[in-house]
Structure formats: structure tokens, C-alpha cells
Amino acid sequence: MKNLVLCLAVVLSPLSMLSQSYDLVIQGGRVIDPETGLDAIRNVGISQGKIRKISAEALAGRRVISAQGLIVAPGFIDLHQHAVDLESQRLKALDGVTTALEMEIGKPDVAAFLQSMEGHSLINYGTTASHPAARSLAFGTPIPTNSLLPKSGTAAAEKPASPEQIEAMKARLRHELDAGALGVGMGLQYTPGVTRWEVIEMFRVAAERSLPVFTHVRSNGKLEPGSNIESVSEVIGAAAVTGAALQIVHINSSCGAQALDCLSLIAGARARGLAVTVEAYPYEAAMTYINSARFNPGWQEKSGATYHDLMLPETGERLTKERFDELHNSSEPRTIILFSNTMENVDLVFRNPLVMVASDGEKDHPRNAGTFCRILARYVRSQGTLTLMDAIRKMSLMPAQVLERSTPAARFKGRLQEGADADVVIFNLQTVTDRATYQHPQEPSQGVEYLLVGGAVLVEKGKLIEGTFPGKALVGEMKR
């Protein structure tokens, strides 16, 4: 009798697995988790927005998605996304992104931003506190409605701040951190009036809360003094003396041909215990505002670019000096695409293991729609310079680990493990690709077959499901 019971237990054990029914089961996909190194055919059980089971055994679910022949990975996390309109969110979802955050220069009113997005977001969202906005307020300058960046020639962009103005900025940033900001965002190239001391004082605000600083460095080209090397050294130094963690954004465009040298500085800082991280996007052209301080006199010598390297995104028009002067002096913010790098340089950047992926996404540039699928198509499938595991790590786990300095909620993102949030991308490695171009920047990527945000299916069979808004806010420590 004892042996019979034992035999029955062995025979029925697979059935016990099936007795647990999940809200949704992803069946038979190649499951990849960059933290544990899992790369195997598995079934994934999801309930109540969480991954509850990953098993080689069959699982039962009220809904089953067949993922045979497909990759099942953690949803991609974009730490550098400007556009938050619904169309941009759709493009992000079709690019495999489950979380997109405005971390570079932040939002001017964090509470208002979070309230405006609640219940209306396809994907997860969040923001830093904006130093450019705090600076504009300290100088009594209205914050531009179409851009947080102060216009070239204004006091908020060009003038050094008084001690009183620096204190006003710090108070504003603390207020925004209290409202749920995930750190401090700075755009130093757009505010050349910022002194080295002001930089350190802003880093101190982040360090008070053990939060990171995300910064666009001054990016002044190869010329000394003030080169890209000096720009990166400046913010690493501020991190060292204050203890704030630091994320340097889009090193591909900020440092150009000097990107590898700048990456060596970052590697050296990390080897000595500093929390310095870095991201990039896989395109040779940048995009910014033409009436910003980035185009102050001397910009051509610093960047190595010409007027003809500037293109209006809406028309494809290449600029002349006369057209540049007209647009630069306009009171209306206008975006411009700047062809100032090469894909050869960009490719080298992404081979570096320190570099994670972020889009710097904004309408009118293909990076808004295609960044993440482009990584898979270009570097994994076409060039073979990244393994699939490494590419997924750069797009999920690495940004999640940066976010862990801002919010414990990030510990459950960027992983495909039991207990993690069910933010999941399912894609076809043979067909996944970006389709957006400089001429047609709104073309969605293809190859993402399914996307889950918090367990809710947002993309099904390559099509966005309309009318569902599962995105949730990620907020800083002080808000919880």
C-alpha cells in the first residue's frame, strides 16, 4: 500500500502543477533573465500583476499565450524619454518598452505631472526634479511651455547664480523630491552660466536623499580648455565630493569621437568606488532646440559641425547661415536634427559593457520609435557584436539597477523571475527591427508580438490594444 501511494504521488505530480491556475500563462517561449543568466524554454505563470511561476513543467492559466519560437524577456526600461503624449507611448510599447522615464532634465512640476498621467498611461512613468526649471524660476524667467530649456541669451541660461538664487534652486528641487521625483535632472550644456559650485550644490541636494543625478554634460568638443574630457570630469568630481550617484546621459552624442576616452574616465571612477553609470542611443544624429545655448557662438568649432549638418525634421530642409540665424533668434522653440557623429563611433560605444540603452525620445527623431528594436536588429542579429543576453541586460536589468537608487519598486523590474513585476516583452528575434527613419520618424517598430505591463496585455500579435492604460508611476523614496 505504501508503495502504491508513492507511485501515485510520482504519477500525479505534474497534475499538481496544473492544479494551480494563473491569470495568464506564457507557454513554451525562450525565457531570458539577465540577472540569473536563465536562457531556456520555460512556461511563465502570471497572476495579479506578478510573475508567480517559471517552470519547465506545464502550467494552467485562464489565458494562455503561445510563445513558441519567440523570446520572452523583461520589459525594456527607458530612462531618458521626453515625449509622454499618447502616440509616443504607443510607439514605445511597440518598441518593447514597459517603463519610460524623463530623467535627463525632469519635469517642472512633479506633482502635476504624476497627476496628469495617472490612469492615462500605457506604460510606467516617472521623472526627476528639473534643475533647468528651478534655475528659470530662481532668475524670475518664465519656464518655456514647449521646452524646459531656457532660451539662449537669457539670464537663466547664461548668467552665474547668486548665493541666494542657488538656495532658491535647492529649495525648489527639495520640494520636487518631496513630491515624488526620482532624482535631480540637469542639462548643463543648455545652461552655460552654471558655475562649478552650482553644480556641486545641486549634487548635494540629491546626495541628501541618497538619490542620483542624471545629467547632460557641457559637451564642448575636443578643444581645450572645456573639452568633453573636462565636461565628464566635472560631473564625476561633483559625484566624488558629494557622494551622489551619477548617470551621464547619451554619451554617444555628448562626447562624439571622444566617447571611448570618456568611457575610460567612467570606468576609472567606478573602479574607485564611485556610483557612475552611462547610457546611449543607437543613432548618429542628435536632436535639440535650435534657440538653446547649445548653439551659442563657437558651436561649430566645438562640435565640428556645419550649418548643412542641421536639418529641420518636419521638412528635411538643410540649413544655411541665414536660415540658422532666423531660427536661432526666434522666440519660438524649434527642434533641429544635428548630424554630428558617425555610426562607427556609435557602434563602438555599444560594445562597451558599461553602456546601457536609453532613447532620448522625442517626436521628430526616429529614436523615439525605434531605439530598442534597433539594438536587437543591428547589434544582435545583423552585426553579432552583442549577445542576446547582453542586449537584454542593457535594456532591462542595467536601467533597473540605476533606478534602485531612486525607488525600491525597481527591484521588481528589469528581471524575469518569480516575484518580479509582470512587465514582459515577447518578440521574434528573426523579424524584430526598427522602421522609423529621419524622413518618417513615427513608423513603429515590428517584431514585438506581445507586451505586458503589470500583467495586462498591451500588445497582442503585434497590435496595440486600445483603451487599456496599465501604466503606473514610479516615485522617489520621499513620496512613499
Segments from the language model and where they lie:
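Active-site neighborhoods of metal-dependent hydrolases
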Residues: 137-194, 236-240, 244-245, 249-388
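Active-site-adjacent beta->alpha loops and helix N-cap segments on the catalytic face
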Residues: 107-112, 193-202
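Divalent-metal coordination cores built from histidine and acidic residues
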Residues: 66-72, 86-185, 274
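Charged helix-capping and loop-helix junction motifs
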Residues: 197-201, 229-234, 371
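Alpha-helix-loop-beta-strand connector modules within alpha/beta enzyme cores
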Residues: 120-125, 200-215, 241
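Active-site microenvironment of metallo-dependent hydrolases
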Residues: 4-7, 17-42, 47, 56, ...
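Hydrophobic faces of well-ordered beta-strands that scaffold small-molecule active sites
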Residues: 75-81, 100-102, 125-129, 184-186, ...
